[in-house]
Design a protein with these regions (language model features):
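A long, low-hydrophobicity, low-complexity, charged/polar interaction segment common
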Residues: 97, 104, 108, 127-152
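Short, charge-rich amphipathic alpha-helices with coiled-coil/heptad character
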Residues: 1-32
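Extended alpha-helical coiled-coil "stalk/arm" regions
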Residues: 27-91, 95-124
């Protein structure tokens, strides 16, 4: 026994619009998910950099004081690394802000594509219900009229 689904011709255009709306919405949802993942990754990296930088600052200052406030090559390179980590943390913060703006735009786009998807789904169901009702009325209208004529 084969399972074949018969799709009436009157539903095919509406189903094509539904498939297109679904694909558009899924693409926007995927982009939003990618953006949310990037935001969380950037926040994690920023937190790691800030944590490393905080402990390195204390270590660097302790070494600087212990060395009699003399800047050695090792202390200079340590300072450069600290500054680089601080700037990287700031870049992660800036990236998070940019991605948050992008996320907000994608939310609006997702809302729009979701609405179009729901409307396309409603159109398919409405068209199917309309055709089925018309067919049912046409199938029963003749016998109903005959019964009314016979009764009168």
């Amino acid at each position: 026994m084969t399972d074949t689904t018969f799709i009436p011709d009157y539903l095919k255009p509406a189903l094509e619009r539904l498939a297109a709306a679904r694909a558009a919405h899924l693409e926007q949802a995927r982009r939003m998910e990618d953006t949310l993942t990037a935001i969380s990754r950037a926040e994690e990296q920023k937190a790691e950099l800030e944590e490393d930088n905080g402990s390195d600052t204390r270590t660097w200052r302790a070494a600087f004081r212990a060395g009699g406030a003399m800047l050695t090559d090792e202390l200079k390179s340590g300072h450069i690394e600290r500054v680089a980590r601080r700037e990287l943390a700031q870049e992660c913060h800036n990236l998070t802000e940019v991605l948050a703006f992008e996320r907000d735009q994608l939310k609006a786009t997702c809302n729009s594509t979701a609405r179009a998807f729901r409307q396309a789904h409603h159109a398919v169901l409405s068209k199917y219900a309309e055709e089925e009702l018309n067919r049912a009325l046409n199938d029963t209208l003749g016998p109903l009229v005959r019964a009314m004529v016979l009764k009168a």
